[in-house]
Structure formats: C-alpha cells, structure tokens
Regions:
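Conserved small/polar residues in nucleotide/adenosyl-binding loops
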Residues: 401-410
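Acidic-basic catalytic patches of nuclease active cores, encompassing PD-(D/E)XK
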Residues: 17-43, 268-301
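Short, contiguous acidic/charged loop-to-helix segments that flank catalytic cores in large enzymes
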Residues: 268-270, 303-312, 338-351
Length: 410
C-alpha cells in the first residue's frame, strides 16, 4: 500500500520522522537521490534543504519513489483545504491547457478520494473505456515488403539493388488498414507504464482490460519529438483527450527508459509560470473587447537609448499590459508567486518596486502598475504609491488575487 504525503509548496517542510506526514531516513535519502539525479531537468532552486527536512520552491505536482506518493500543492485556498487547493490547481492546469480536463461535480467529488497521480490515471482510464466501447482506432499504414503476390505498387528499382531476395518474391509498396499505428502504440505504452507503477488492484484490473484491445499493437520505444508533434484530424479526434493524458504520463513516467524499470518519477509544474499564464488568460477574458486589448509579455518598450549607437537597450517585458485604445491609457500587471506577508510582517522587495517604476515611466500612457500577489490572508490592504509630480497621475499598487472555487467560475 502506498504512503501518501501532502505538503504546501514553500509553506510546509517535509521532515524525517515516524509521523503520518513524515519520511523515514531511507525514504528521505531516496528522495534526495532522485532530485540530485534529475537536477538537469528540474531547476536548481526547486528545493530548500536543511537538517533532516526539505521544502519545495516554485514547483507543484507529484513525486513517486519507493512506496511513497509525495503531493506538492500550491497554497491557494484561505481555509487550508487540501481538496480545494487540489481542485483549484487542476482548474489552473485546465484553463492553461496543460491537461485535457474540464472540471465538473463528478471530478470534484473524486478529488476527495484520489491523490493527483491516481486522479490523472483514473481520468485516463475512464476516457479510454469510453472510446474502446466505440472500437479501437484504425488508420492506413504505409508498408514496404517482399511478397509472394503483387500488392499495391511494385518497386523495381529497389528490388534490383537488394541482394539475397528470393526470385519468387516481389518488392511491393502498399497501404494497410491497421490498428498497429502510432496513436495506439502511445496508448498501449501509457497503459503498460501505469501497470508497472501504480500499486492499486482496481486500477490494474481496469488497465489489463483496456490492454486486451491492443493485442495486435506493438510495444515500441516512443520518440519524444514524435510524441509532441502528433496531429489530430477528423478520424482520430475522439482519442485526443486519451492521447494528451497518455502523453503527460509518458513524458514523466518512462520516456527515458524503454524497459519500464524506473525507481522514481515525477509530474511537476512550475507554479510561477503557471500562475502568470493563468492570470493572463483570466484577465484577457474579462478585459478584451473591440477597443481594449491584453498583451502578455509585451516587448515593445526599452528602458534606455544608447547615445553613441542610437539603439534602444534593456528591453522591458511586463507580464501583462492592458491597453484601452479608446481612452488611451494602459494598466501594467506583474504577477508575483510569493507571499507578500510572512508572520504578520510585510515584505516589499525593492527590486520589484524599481522594476515597476521602470515599467510605468517607460509606458507614457500607463496610469497604474500593479504587483499582483496570491492572497493567503483575508481582509488585508497593502501599499499604494504615487509617483512624483513629474509623473502626475501614475501609481504603483500592491494587490492580492483570491482564487475562486472552480464552482464559482461555472
């Protein structure tokens, strides 16, 4: 039986001990070994290590090793509700098109019973079951073989060059309507990977039943580029959700190992980037109309102009710029995935304020520059600064974003 540990990114430490939410000495060393081994994939500042404890910085998701499933969640709810934080994280991933999942009541209820890994796997299984009832996917596969009878097109030029071919054989090129295609090979590989890694009798039973449909599909090494570049059309579109979930699992579970014998694996998302993208999509959906536009990572402005060369230097790139073309003004928003307040002490980084000052002075029509932090405490107001008279009517504000429940978003 798996051991489940839940922690909040940045806010909670994983400790060595015998408690319910603690790691043994052996488990702790296994985790450190995995993180060290994957240091080229994960950014170096992912962990903060102290004596017999560590915490994760800027990454959320799951890490599985030995019999441990470690779930790292962002602190998004004001009530410290694990299920709600998990729910809002999935909503963020869904809106940002990181996962092919649309939140509904059935999914919300399942989050009470499943960690993130089992949730992804169960959603994949249910999607596969739905499509398998309609039948496995077939497509025409281009094949070249030496045959006893003519089929398709005869390849005389290649036949003449090859040695050792029986004179009774014919070199043919033809199309075969087959289930042994790349899409099915990916789905089968994902099922095998799940079977090797998820120690749950119910899940294993369902996966084995799905695999019975793929007996004539080869188990192959899946090329990463080919996996990422696969296209969908009218005939294969019904398998899109299944494929995208299989891709998510394969990219993290087994892409570097065709023998399925990894000791550990992870599915992690960089929360700072995810938060920025999520806020951008939400604001764009509210702000944009016929005379208002939202620009993400706008690169139109520079801080300085070089007197010798005449070239502009030091490109500014605010996270979000809101343009009002009718009233000719701009609002600049920079998202910050960090706590503005720790132990009742408010911390404004001077570098952040200087950055906002550079933005609001470079954008001539900018009225407000907003530092947007996640809200972790109710009913709090933070500073607003007015610029000097030479920049009349310009303000820098610190505001908080409170994540609504996905129910509130419909």
């Amino acid at each position: 039986m798996s051991k489940n540990i839940y922690v909040k990114e940045t806010y909670e430490w994983i400790r060595v001990g015998n408690g319910e939410n603690e790691l043994t000495e052996i488990e702790y060393e296994k985790l450190l070994k995995y993180l060290e081994k994957n240091n080229d994939v994960l950014k170096s500042n992912i962990i903060d290590i102290k004596y017999k404890k560590l915490r994760f910085i800027n990454y959320v998701g799951i890490i599985c090793f030995e019999n441990v499933i470690l779930e790292i969640l962002p602190k998004l709810s004001l009530s410290d509700n694990l299920v709600k934080d998990r729910e809002i994280l999935l909503q963020m991933l869904s809106i940002c098109n990181k996962i092919p999942i649309t939140m509904n009541e059935k999914i919300r209820l399942s989050l009470k019973n499943y960690n993130l890994l089992n949730f992804f796997v169960m959603y994949f299984i249910e999607s596969m079951q739905t499509q398998m009832k309609k039948g496995i996917y077939f497509e025409y596969i281009n094949k070249i073989e030496n045959l006893n009878v003519m089929r398709g097109k005869i390849l005389l030029s290649t036949y003449a060059k090859e040695k050792g071919i029986s004179p009774m054989k014919i070199r043919c090129k033809y199309d075969e309507y087959s289930e042994n295609n790349f899409l099915n090979q990916v789905l089968k590989k994902a099922c095998i990977s799940i079977l090797c890694r998820i120690n749950d009798n119910s899940i294993q039973g369902k996966i084995k039943k799905i695999l019975s449909y793929f007996q004539n599909v080869d188990l192959i090494y899946i090329d990463r580029k080919k996996l990422l570049d696969y296209k969908f059309y009218k005939n294969n579109d019904r398998f899109k959700d299944c494929y995208l979930l299989a891709r998510l699992l394969l990219l993290n579970l087994s892409m570097d190992n065709s023998q399925n014998n990894q000791e550990a694996f992870s599915i992690l998302f960089e929360i700072n980037t995810l938060y920025e993208e999520y806020i951008g999509i939400l604001i764009k959906s509210i702000w944009d109309n016929s005379f208002r536009e939202t620009y993400i990572q706008d690169k139109s402005k520079f801080l300085l102009k070089n007197e010798q060369t005449g070239k502009k230097n030091f490109n500014l790139r605010p996270d979000i710029v809101l343009y009002d073309l009718k009233n000719e003004y701009e609002i600049i928003i920079d998202t910050k995935w960090k706590a503005i307040e720790v132990d009742s002490n408010v911390f404004y980084r001077s570098s952040d304020i200087y950055q906002m000052y550079a933005y609001i002075t470079a954008y001539e029509n900018a009225k407000r520059c907003i530092l947007l932090y996640p809200c972790i405490q109710k009913d709090k107001n933070y500073s607003s600064w007015k610029l000097s008279e030479s920049f009349k009517g310009k303000f820098i504000d610190c505001l908080l974003y409170t994540s609504p429940s996905p129910r509130d978003r419909g």
